[in-house]
Amino acid sequence: MYVYLLGLYLGDGSISTFARGVYRLRITLDVKYPGIINMAVAAATEIRGRPAAVHPQGEDSCVNVSSYWKAWPCLFPQHGPGRKHQRRIVLTRWQEELAKRWPDELLRGLIHSDGCRFMNTGRGGWVCPRYSFVQASDDIRSIFCHACDLVGVRWTKSGQRTIYVSRKADVAKLDEFIGPKR
């Protein structure tokens, strides 16, 4: 569950200081996908050992999965001032080891936060499923691509921020452990 939560954190997560040395882990998710919200709550709850909470995020389309704990910066040492895409993001050695053992969980978290599976269409009426991952951080895109390499999935870049998985066999491989958002 940690590697999945790491993927969510790298995509749409943040850690902020709270009272008395406690930190708040917050993962912002779309309300259209209650299954992903439930998985995020389960992951944060399992790691923390206490129930995570779901709070509305300003507008009606998002919620924050939140958990308070002094240890969050230890588990996510990428925490720091500023936006993740404006600073260096590097996995620690122990995080790399976990990501190598469970690259599928890391990919699931990254896709659930900053990716999607959609039907690509073209001239002549052809339709085929495709995954995209859009992320402003070069470092996080690199982490995504490395995880794809670990599971044997080919990827391509499009523009500065988008990674696609388009080949039929590679999409089928991701479907084994990710699939459409729910």
What are these regions (language model features)?
Residues 1-182:
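Internal intein/HINT superfamily modules and their associated LAGLIDADG
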